[in-house]
Regions:
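N-terminal glycine-rich FAD/FM-binding segment characteristic of electron-transfer flavoproteins
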Residues: 1-254
Length: 254
């Protein structure tokens, strides 16, 4: 059987979470196809074709997919889903927005945030803020899955040689509109992918004291995180937040 992995990218570069999701897909199916949907994203499709374990890249280039609107992408996935036994995406903000729509369109139950694959229909996922692990079994013909990427090692981005198949599938649901991006720029590693994280809590007392963490973070090449208490106190923005209600991380040093 064949798995379809939904790639995460910004129309110029593939996100690392895609590589971890492919590892999860390899535990389910013998063949893996990777969907690259976007606008002017040919470079993403070309880099996707070199990923280890991917046999085919489905490349769809249209303005309707430029901003990864879940309403449009979910229709695309539904229309190409017939050949797949499982459809996987990273459990990122985009993945969590997209995959429930896909599951609804296919009339199946989504399997959320898996951390291990026991068999082709049985999975583990954390519950109760990660304090327990649930084992879940799906009887649906098509499995729609989001993957906790920190639980799976990434595949190599360079050792593959996949076919690129360009599709002319264009879908505009007409019910949502992209307004703008508000991006926080930083020279530090992305929190969810960082090997080293320095995190502050309520004990930092105020936002200015978080500046004290920057020097050592720069020396270590670390990302800076924060507890929910620090975020709720207004010390730092919520994109710093680590944990169940924030970002899921798996650094080598915390």
């Amino acid at each position: 059987m064949t798995a379809l992995v939904i790639s995460e990218h910004d129309n110029s570069e593939l996100k690392g979470a895609t590589l971890n999701t492919i590892t999860a897909a390899q535990k389910l199916d013998d063949e893996i196809h990777l969907l690259v949907a976007g606008s002017n994203c040919n470079s993403v499709a070309e880099s996707a074709a070199t990923i280890e374990g991917v046999s085919k890249v489905l490349y769809v280039d249209s303005p309707e997919y430029e901003n990864f609107l879940a309403e449009n992408i979910s229709l695309l996935i539904k229309n190409i889903s017939n050949d797949y036994s499982s459809i996987l995406a990273p459990a990122t903000t985009n993945g969590k927005n997209l995959m429930p729509r896909v599951a609804a369109l296919l009339d199946v139950a989504q399997i959320s945030d898996i951390s291990a694959v026991e068999s082709k229909d049985t999975f583990q996922r954390p519950i109760y803020a990660g304090n327990c692990i649930a084992t879940v079994k799906s009887s649906d013909e098509v499995k729609v899955i989001t993957v906790r990427t920190t639980a799976f090692d990434p595949v190599s981005p360079e050792s593959g040689s996949a076919e690129i198949l360009k599709l002319e599938e264009v879908n505009d649901a007409g019910i949502s509109q992209f307004i703008k991006d508000e991006l926080a720029e930083s020279d530090r590693p992305e929190l969810t992918a960082a090997d080293v994280i320095i995190s502050g809590g309520r004990g930092m007392q105020n936002g200015e004291n978080f500046n004290l963490l920057e020097g050592i973070a720069d020396k270590l090449g670390a990302a800076i995180g924060a507890s929910r208490a620090a975020v709720d106190s207004g010390f730092v923005p919520n994109d710093y937040q680590v944990g169940q209600t924030g970002k899921i991380v798996a650094p080598n040093l915390y």
